[in-house]
């Protein structure tokens, strides 16, 4: 998907909201439904793939905003892990939308790695959680490069799309 998404300059105005069983945090709407909006005669497979990948970054942005508001802490770096981190397009777009660096570790499956470290800590292989923290190694850092106006426009369009999919399902009407 990385090469497909990178083959077009943008989504051509297409936005994808993956609300297959409603929207979770921070929108909390069980009646929202997934949608793709902005389809035109010029919409291509590449635009669709890119819109789907961008939707992941937009969702992370929305949740990061809530975390910043609730904690009062503004972050300049986000650490990412898991399968999606191998997609360089997605990680760069994530940095652009967050307007923050995104750090990807050498070991991308940190959930399993973390569970192993906690088990090792529990049996005394490490003296403290600080020893475990020292095992995290940076694989790649993605720096934001999108201009403020472009970022704000894309976020505004994303939020318009999210609002349109809310309350779609009418309860007890099937």
Where are these regions (language model features)?
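Glycine/Thr-rich phosphate-binding loops that ligate phosphate moieties of nucleotide
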Residues: 1-174
């Amino acid at each position: 998907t990385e090469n497909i998404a990178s083959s077009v300059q943008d989504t051509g105005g297409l936005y994808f909201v993956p609300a297959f069983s409603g929207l979770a945090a921070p929108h909390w709407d069980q009646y929202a439904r997934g949608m793709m909006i902005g389809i035109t005669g010029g919409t291509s497979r590449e635009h669709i793939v890119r819109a789907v990948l961008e939707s992941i970054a937009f969702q992370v942005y929305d949740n990061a905003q809530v975390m910043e508001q609730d904690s009062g802490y503004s972050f300049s770096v986000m650490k990412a892990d898991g399968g999606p981190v191998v997609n360089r397009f997605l990680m760069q777009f994530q940095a652009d939308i967050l307007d923050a660096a995104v750090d990807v570790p050498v070991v991308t499956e940190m959930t399993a790695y973390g569970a192993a470290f906690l088990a090792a800590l529990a049996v005394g292989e490490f003296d403290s959680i600080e020893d475990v923290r020292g095992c995290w190694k940076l694989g790649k850092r993605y720096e934001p490069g999108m201009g403020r106006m472009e970022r704000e426009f894309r976020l505004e369009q994303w939020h318009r799309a999210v609002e349109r999919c809310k309350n779609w399902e009418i309860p007890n009407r099937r």
